[in-house]
Regions:
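Sec-dependent N-terminal signal peptides
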Residues: 4-14
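Beta-propeller folds
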Residues: 8, 19-211
Length: 211
């Protein structure tokens, strides 16, 4: 028993001798922070993902299996009638036939921002503004991809893509710091960690929102 105890103590001493010393500086600067992959969006087929190119001009398609580029979904230089030089982000429609291209992003609070969005038709390679009425917030495709709801100046708007992108105003009483439709105020955004307060029903016929 005495020999076993001595052996265990020797092993412990050896392990401690090789142990890595962690400094406060390393912890404070994130030296041991877990690495991650950011900015990738999986596609419906489960085999590919998309990502913005380094120059901010393309949405590039990659293979999960190989990690290699396999195609380009959107390119500001080849899309028809596109005047954009670059873009900030994008939102795919549920069926991936349309993409909302986000430009001119301006922060409001930590998670909220306004931006100018464009609708890109993947099949036709065409692009057009989501709205001509000014920057938008938190645009959302309906489940069938035929409608887009968004907030502007504290009111909710609806764009129907099957009817010539006709735009209608859903709420009309929005007022800065008084009445907010479809978006949280600063406190709720901070405490609950969200920036959109509306959603479509599963069949896309109704819109629920917080006021």
């Amino acid at each position: 028993m005495k020999k076993l105890s001595i052996l265990m103590m020797l092993c412990l001493c050896v392990c401690l001798g090789y142990a890595q010393q962690v400094t406060l500086q390393e912890v404070a600067t994130g030296a041991y922070r877990a690495e991650g992959i950011y900015g990738i969006k999986p596609m419906l087929d489960g085999e590919h993902y998309t990502q913005i190119s380094r120059d901010g001009k393309k949405i590039v398609k990659y293979s999960f299996k190989t990690g290699q580029e396999v195609g380009t979904v959107f390119d500001v230089e080849t899309a028809r009638d596109c005047t954009l030089k670059r873009f900030d982000d994008y939102i795919m429609s549920p069926d991936e036939t349309k993409i909302l291209i986000q430009t001119e992003t301006k922060p409001i609070y930590r998670r909220s921002f306004t931006a100018v969005y464009y609708i890109f038709n993947v099949r036709n390679n065409t692009i057009e503004p989501l709205s001509d009425g000014g920057p938008q917030q938190v645009p959302l495709f309906s489940p069938d991809g035929n409608q887009i709801a968004f907030v502007r100046d504290n009111n909710i708007y609806l764009v129907k893509l099957l009817f010539g992108n006709s735009e209608s105003q859903v709420t009309k009483d929005g007022k800065f710091n008084h009445v907010l439709n479809g978006i949280p105020d600063w406190v709720y955004e901070e405490e609950f960690g969200f920036n959109r307060a509306f959603d479509f029903s599963a069949d896309g016929t109704m819109l629920a929102y917080i006021r």
